[in-house]
UniProtKB/Swiss-Prot annotation:
GO molecular function: ATP binding; ATP-dependent DNA damage sensor activity; double-stranded DNA binding; mismatched DNA binding
Subcellular location: Nucleus
Species annotation: Emericella nidulans (strain FGSC A4 / ATCC 38163 / CBS 112.46 / NRRL 194 / M139)
GO CC annotations on file: nucleus
Biased composition range(s): Polar residues: 74-84
GO BP annotations listed: mismatch repair; mitotic recombination
Stretches with biased composition (Acidic residues): 167-177
Protein name (Swiss-Prot/TrEMBL): DNA mismatch repair protein msh3
Subunit (UniProt): Heterodimer consisting of msh2-msh3 (MutS beta). Forms a ternary complex with MutL alpha (mlh1-pms1).
Record: residues binding ATP: G877, P878, N879, M880, G881, G882, K883, S884
Region (Disordered): 1-132, 166-195
Annotated SUPFAM superfamilies: DNA repair protein MutS, domain I, DNA repair protein MutS, domain III, P-loop containing nucleoside triphosphate hydrolases
Pfam families per the UniProt record, alphabetical: MutS_I (PF01624), MutS_II (PF05188), MutS_III (PF05192), MutS_V (PF00488)
Family according to the record: Belongs to the DNA mismatch repair MutS family. MSH3 subfamily.
Length: 1105
């Protein structure tokens, strides 16, 4: 098939044949091959190449990147060969591969090899045309698939150099060493190829971090290799290219020659890191520490890029989440963990069984805020103390130092092992060894760590630093062991500096707060409901009206640690009252307006600045927000100017303007527009730039000036006065020449063709190439200098961290007080009255959470408990009558009062309770091999050990896990002990009517019987019960369990049988009691002198009837 007339035939174009030799042509003898001309014929031959290229192109206007001219020696003379166009080169490559395949398929003894080679060189014109057409179609197919020779790939690689150093290095790292052609008749060895230089780097880094998923930066992507690729593909739903998954030379993978791999774009790094971290993985980021321009100027230009593990992330240490810094509140659907990482260690257990004791130390760190909590304590065989601290702190990660006892290990597994646990998500657990001399080694390690801090402290801070150091060195041994392990652990993530913030060390067991143990947090639903473990329906959800994230975190601490100091409580509740009543309307609106303007988590932002991990736009936003906060109340000079009488409000407002001077000082160094656009080169104002930055900027300016001066020189070569530079596809300083102009014939051979279209060609002169390389080197050095100066600025701001953090804490206090004031302004809430007496007197109290979730109105009830009067209530009533809701309501009102909140009631007088204990619900503990009844009694035993006369104790149906006689006996003994010995305020729920007789044992009314009221209608099968949900005096002698069975839709025949059996049992018991009464009367009649025991028996029999 002949070519169209517009194209010369292949056979009639010796120029084409001469300019497009294939690689195989150098190894195949060709008869009468014309000698290659050594003369420089200018760009004329290229025109023919361009015509062929244009013919093969799908789009005539598409940019084509030209290869670089190559120099070869022929017969001792240097020859400059004009390179082929990319498409022609691809055609020749196809010919080469075809030739190689043909050579491999021939027999060595075949006499026709030479003949066939000669015949191939003497193809007629039509055969060559057909071959070219096939190659043209194949080339289009390759282009559609984006092969290695496609125009897009070549265009990206040719940026001012013969080949992009970065991409060339990637190719060198990925490609294995070419294997020599196997001798004929021998099979090639499968797999087991040499590792590429980059794969050797990966293995070297991976061997040091086998527990970490590594993301390796390779050019424009981050790649996973081996087993990491399989995990990433599963978690991120990305493609995994098959290959070796193991990092050792295992025989099972001997047939594979490449690692399995997966990749993500550079700009999506933190999106995917966040997903991997949330799934519980430890993730490491390995970055290239060299850039293409600097590598080109260095001595190791042919070596692979230097790579290093720069960042390691886990759930608690992932502080680079920019999204979490934005938004006013953490409106998560579930009740997630608090971001703490908790380190725990314990000594060997002492004792056995129920007498087992362990000595435990903990240190919990919140890297995102800088808070640190520590404690040392003894715990019993139920591990209730450990459970309490775990539920309060709610860590998302745990570090276990040494071996734990069996009971502790089971508790940790139970609380952290499931995604639907009380922490809201699965907890990541790591382990660290513990030496026999751990205490001494830890003291030495901690001392050296804080001694270095003291060396760097200013002279003015020496005394403060010394006091803080003494405080740290005075920590108990178990806490010091945990602190040492935490320092080592946080150093791995580059966050060890957070442990230098000793001002924020807090002791967990401080007696300035009410104790809420693990059972209480769960039973009263303080942080989470017991249905789906979300925050909705919890006490925290009810109180939370905060507008900032740092305010929300502070309120969470307030809820979990109610105050014991009456004066502090009154200050807080008076502040809430002032904000609620709008006594100073203008100032209240200013506070609310200021809180509403804050859209970033300043507490997390400040700690990121402290770590040196803050971005430029984020730094600008934080400083501008802090400036706005400080300026809002800059006119306040004294507490009287605030207009508030409450010290809590006035002190918080007074502390806000103190940071204004420092914040303005830092902002004056920053170019606002550049910082907002994340422009590192112009981030600093000109007068604030470092000498290094200025030097490299001048260097870039000098190079750009030389490039401008080169324009006339380049124009002279083309016969013009001056050329105009153009920029195309990110490539600058291109000299553009029209293909149909006379200038195209004047282009020197030394000029490098970078790209072109049908109408124009674009070139770089050798001088431009050299100057662009110099400019790029200056740019890379400038970028490093800008990063260095930015880190120095963050370090300078970090010296004022505590002052800035105190300002944020003051703002958080105002946010919490405004939140409580918003709640207090709702109808039916009252300010509680506080007293030093141990009492709870509430009129028309309501359940704070249930009334918000119910569509109907909640039925209020009174409660009167006093240590000097009635201090215990025995609560009875029908099933589903509201007993548990009533006792929970009492406990929640007491806790709300000591938080400093208004309470849902008409009136409330509250004493200072030191703890609230609950024993509610029935469940077993299969992990510990304990039955339901064993769990009940163990928890009750813990309460009896810890309760004091100032505690509130709630016991719900104690003794139901065993037989009636044993259950009644245990319940009666526990209740008697609580009222007589411990003298706590007690609410005791039971269905044992026999216990109601205990009130006669307390003639002064320390124990009273109350019941949940109800009304009956109908008789027999038509009996109907209406729950009134009101508390009344006396005892409910029936539980009406059959009514609940009917509501549960049990089968009708079953209900009838149950009614019949219930009636028979009641009649039997009634006859027995009647017989007992008759016997008691007979005993009185027969005895001449009725002693007290006989009289008591008679009275008891009458009450039973």
């Amino acid at each position: 098939m002949p070519l169209p007339s517009s194209q010369p035939s292949a056979s009639s174009s010796p120029n084409l044949k001469r300019k497009q030799p294939t690689i195989s042509s150098f190894f195949t003898k060709k008869p009468q091959a014309p000698k290659q001309s050594t003369s420089n014929e200018g760009p004329a031959p290229i025109d023919n190449d361009s015509e062929i290229t244009d013919k093969l192109a799908e789009d005539d206007e598409e940019d084509i990147v030209a290869p670089v001219p190559k120099r070869t020696k022929s017969n001792g003379s240097l020859t400059v060969n004009r390179p082929q166009s990319p498409k022609a080169k691809s055609v020749s490559r196809v010919e080469q591969e075809s030739s190689q395949r043909t050579e491999l398929s021939k027999f060595a003894s075949s006499p026709a090899i030479e003949t066939e080679g000669n015949e191939a060189t003497e193809l007629d014109g039509s055969a060559k045309v057909r071959q070219q057409e096939r190659e043209k179609l194949h080339q289009r197919f390759v282009r559609k698939l984006g092969g290695p020779d496609c125009l897009v790939g070549i265009g990206r690689n040719c940026v001012g150099e013969t080949t992009s150093i970065e991409e060339a290095a990637e190719g060198d790292e990925d490609d294995e060493t070419p294997q020599p052609v196997q001798p004929k008749g021998k099979a090639g060895k499968k797999g087991g190829g040499k590792l590429t230089p980059m794969e050797k780097q990966v293995i070297e880094i991976k061997k040091k971090h086998m527990d970490t998923i590594l993301l390796i930066e390779v050019g424009y992507k981050f790649r996973f290799f081996g087993e990491d690729a399989r995990i990433a593909a599963k978690e991120l739903s990305i493609v995994c290219i098959p290959g070796k998954f193991r990092y050792d030379e295992h025989p099972s993978e001997a047939h594979l020659d490449r690692f399995a791999s997966a990749s993500i774009p550079v700009q999506r790094l933190h999106v995917h890191v966040k997903r991997l971290v949330a799934a519980g993985h430890k993730v490491g980021v390995v970055r290239q520490l060299e850039t293409a321009a600097l590598k080109a100027a260095g001595d190791n230009r042919n070596a692979p890029f230097v790579r290093k593990l720069t960042n390691v992330y886990t759930k608690s240490t992932y502080i680079d989440d920019i999204e979490s810094l934005e938004g006013s509140t953490a409106g998560a659907s579930g009740a997630s963990a608090t971001g703490y990482i908790l380190c725990i260690t314990e000594t060997n257990a002492r004792g056995w069984g129920n007498d087992e004791k362990v000595h435990v130390g903990i240190v919990a760190v919140q890297p995102t805020t800088g808070d640190i909590v520590y404690d040392e304590f003894d715990d019993g065989f139920m591990r209730s103390e450990i459970e309490t601290r775990l539920l309060h702190i709610a860590p998302c990660e745990m570090l276990i130092v040494g071996e734990l006892s069996k009971a502790t290990e089971k508790l940790v597994q139970h609380l952290s092992g499931s995604k639907m646990n009380v922490f809201g998500d699965k907890v990541r657990v790591e382990r660290a060894p513990k030496a026999k001399t751990a205490a001494a080694e830890s003291h030495s390690h901690v001392s050296s760590f804080y001694a270095e801090k003291m060396k760097s402290a200013d002279a003015a801070d020496d005394e403060v630093a010394s006091n803080l150091l003494q405080k740290v060195l005075g920590l108990p041994d178990q806490v010091t062991i945990c602190l040492s392990a935490m320092i080592k652990h946080m150093t791995e993530y580059g966050l060890e500096h957070v442990l230098q913030l000793t001002k924020y060390f807090q002791h967990f067991s401080s007696r300035s707060h009410m104790l809420l143990n693990g059972n209480t947090l769960t039973s009263l639903e303080i942080y989470q409901n017991q249905t789906d473990y979300s925050s909705k329906g919890s006490l925290f959800w009810t109180l939370d009206r905060t507008q900032t994230r740092f305010g929300q975190r502070m309120l969470r601490k307030w809820v979990g640690r109610p105050l014991l100091d009456r004066r502090q409580l009154e200050d807080r509740v008076n502040a809430v009252e002032e904000l609620k009543d709008f006594r100073n309307v203008v100032m209240v609106e200013r506070i609310k307006g200021l809180l509403g303007k804050i859209k970033h988590d300043l507490e997390k932002g400040l700690i990121r600045i402290y770590y040196g991990k803050c971005s430029r736009p984020e730094l600008l936003t934080i400083l501008q927000t802090m400036q706005m906060i400080a300026q809002e109340f800059a006119d306040i000079e004294s507490p009287a100017d605030t207009g508030f009488s409450s010290p809590a409000i006035s002190q918080a407002i007074m502390s806000l303007p103190t940071i204004l001077k420092d914040v303005v000082f830092f902002l004056n160094k920053i170019n606002m527009h550049a910082a907002r656009n994340d422009d590192k080169y112009e981030f600093f104002r000109e007068e604030e730039e470092t000498e290094e930055i200025s030097e490299h900027k001048l260097g870039i300016g000098a190079v750009e000036h030389e490039l401008e001066e080169h324009r006339p020189v380049a124009g002279e070569a083309l016969g013009k006065k001056m050329v105009t530079y153009v920029s195309v596809a990110g490539i600058d300083y291109l000299v553009e020449v029209e293909n149909n102009s006379p200038a195209i014939k004047r282009v020197p051979a030394s000029w490098m063709k970078i790209s072109g279209t049908k109408k124009v060609s674009r070139f770089h002169t050798p001088e431009v190439v050299k100057m662009i390389r110099q400019r790029d080197q200056h740019r890379e050095a400038l970028a490093a200098a800008c990063d260095k100066a930015f880190l120095a600025l963050q370090a300078e701001i970090a010296t004022n961290y505590q002052a800035l953090r105190d300002c944020v804490q003051s703002l958080a206090t105002l946010d919490c007080l405004v939140s409580l004031a918003t709640l207090a302004s709702q109808p039916g809430y009252v300010k509680p009255e506080y007293t030093e007496e141990t009492c709870i007197h509430v009129e028309q109290g309501r359940h704070p959470m249930v009334e918000q979730l119910l569509l109907d109105s909640y039925v209020p009830n009174d409660i009167n408990l006093d240590s000097s009067k009635t201090r215990a209530l025995l609560v009875t009533g029908p099933n589903m009558g509201g007993k548990s809701s009533y006792v929970r309501q009492v406990a929640l009102i007491a806790i709300m009062g000591q938080i400093g909140s208004y309470v849902p009631a008409q009136a409330a007088k509250l004493g200072m309770l030191d703890a609230v204990f609950t024993r509610m619900g029935a469940f077993d503990n299969m992990l510990a091999g304990e039955s339901t009844f064993m769990v009940e009694l163990s928890e009750t035993a813990d309460i009896l050990k810890q309760a004091t006369p100032r505690s509130l104790v709630i016991l719900d149906e104690l003794g139901r896990g065993t037989s009636t006689h044993d259950g009644v006996a245990i319940a009666q003994a526990v209740l008697d002990y609580m009222v007589r010995s411990i003298r706590s305020l007690t609410l005791f729920i039971t269905h044992y009517q026999h216990l109601s007789a205990m009130v006669h044992s307390f003639p002064d009314g320390e124990l009273r019987n109350v019941h949940m009221r109800f009304s009956e209608s109908g008789t027999g099968a038509d009996e109907d019960i209406t729950f009134l949900y009101e508390i009344g005096e006396g005892v409910a002698h029936r539980s009406y369990g059959l009514n609940v069975a009917r509501l549960a839709n049990l089968p009708a025949p079953l209900l009838e049988m149950a009614k019949q059996k219930s009636a028979e049992l009641e009649e039997k018991i009634r006859r027995r009691r009647l017989a007992g009464f008759v016997a008691a009367v007979g005993a009185v009649v027969q005895s001449n002198q009725a002693d007290e025991s006989v009289i008591e028996r008679l009275v008891s029999s009458m009450e039973e009837l």
